[in-house]
Amino acid sequence: MDEISIRSHWVSAWSTSPIDASLSETGILDRLGVAVTDVSARTAVQLTAGGTHVRLTLSNVFGVLPLHVAACTVAIGADDARGIEPDTLRTVTFGGEGHVRIAAGTSCTSDAAALPVTAGQTLTVTVFYRGINAMRTIGLIGGCSYAELGNCTRRPLLHLAIPMQHTAETGAYEVIPALTEIDVLAAPGTHACVIFGDSTVANELPRLLAARLRADGIENVSVTQAAIKGDRLVADGVGRAAKLLGGAGVKRFERDVLAQAGADMVLVKLGANDLIHPHCRSKQGLLTPVTFAQMTAGYRALADMAHAQGVRIWFCELTPWKGYTRNLFGRGDDIQWSPELDALRPELNAWFQSADCPADGYIPLDALADPDDPDALIATYTTDGVHHTPAGQRALAALIPEDIFRETPKEVHP
């Protein structure tokens, strides 16, 4: 073992949670089923930790056929997300080879590539996929991706790039093929905090929080993302966009959070969709309202899984949603807020603060609420009554207490 490996360890510096992009019964995901025929995908992401080397995790967890990676490179990104800084280009290998075939239902982590990176820097990953496959495993938040025909892994700038974005009535999505995690070989004491949740944190929160911590002198914490828009705590997604909404939080927690390199903290903001979706017109007959016991059992399961691996866990306040109507698929208002429909949310927030809750802490977010109407968010903080504007995201990042990151981290898994 060389001196670097003795002194340093792997820490996740970026992540996204995969979803199944295969076709649904109604075809709502047709344009997300990414066809792959001798094409390169270039993804630019912002790292939240620095190190001397990088490694990648590519996932085919939802695939039914092998995924053939014929070539792969990493480089520091250029100002134009389609480009790279050519002098920083590095070849990525897998078990010493420049190619790999990822079996259906599995993921693959690359060898280390020697490329010094810093927190806040853009890393660009370019993967050349050979052969005809149906790429079913994609992320939908956290990067900017382009596709171009042929092997473009060493090309300084993509000239015929096709943006891999998807805009639907359920929201805007950044399609990220196969790439689910980027680790850095970081200095001793560096560790990762994972933000786990739904669309209220499937935004710029990880980057904003990481930048705030660095500005405050906390430079040994990366902040990564494990949020899926529409995700629920205790049940899988249902309805026209079921696969788009991800699997239940209690099912994906181990894969999306606990498996991340160097993760020893998780902030959970998940549960609003469990409360809202059963009352939506579009989901009538598909769901029954959840109970307090079901929800607290779900949160206990997360805490138990986290603590079993030595990971500390905080539950964030479930924020107000008055004014949210969820007008999807052109059907008009899908739900109308009422005190009765919102009754369980304050009960759960109270439980988070009780001695009965097994979490390591609670993060109050009541400062996001309208002082004149605490059941609603401040108007400038929300786009639709539940989701956060850039100002709302910055406000949320500012409310996460700094002291939880100043505690000395325990030894974390590589």
Model segments located where?
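Alpha/beta-hydrolase-fold catalytic nucleophile elbow
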Residues: 269-270, 316-317, 365
